[in-house]
Amino acid sequence: MDFSIKAFDTKNTLAAAKTGCVAVAVFENKKLSAAAKALDQHGDITAALKSGDISGKAGSTLLLRGLAGTSAQRVLLVGMGADETVSEKNFVSAVNAALKAFASLGATDAIIAFPVEQVKERDLNWAVRAIVIASNDAEFRADRQKSKRDPAPAGVRKVAIATPAATPALKAALAQSIAIGNGMNLTRELGNLSPNVCTPTYLAGVARELAGDYGFDVEVLDRKQLEALKMGSFLAVAKGSEEAPKFI
């Protein structure tokens, strides 16, 4: 998934955004988030809540197509619980629900316009990171060693996160979030590899490759260096394998 930060205001409005889908939050008390209100120009979202088509419970969803007054092809209503001061748990549930819905859409791009500044005891950077990491979790496939790999995820491939302003600090937070998510997925992938593949030598190679790609230093100690450092406990464990020990 490709992520970006998109700021909306009175001139560059959410309603005018041309995209495959906009995800906005609604609440159990039949109240609309600010983004939902901005799209509810003809009362269709309010009507959907009043009719009971969506409960507003965290993770509930309702897809509306061709909503009057909006340029988006689809509007996804996502429940975020009872409290407009959103809990961390409810925010993550809503994000996961939106991502699940995105995966089954014919659209290729979308906007997540959630109340990212209303999560209890969390800041905007946390909300951006939560969205990115949830996406990485949803897309991860443990199929590296399968003879037939799982098909690539369909649906939405580009997501813009709506925020009050696209500041350099927020863009840096997005870049950091993507890096964290990629690192988590690399860790999962290494952990899922069979031990005859993911050997100490293999791990050392991965470390050196990362160092070359991202410009940091890495040192890999071999058996002689470990003996010189008197790392007896480490070497004792390594004696149980034919593979040469490496300490990264």
What are these language model-derived features?
Residues 1-248:
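Short amphipathic alpha-helical segment within the helicase RecA-like ATPase core
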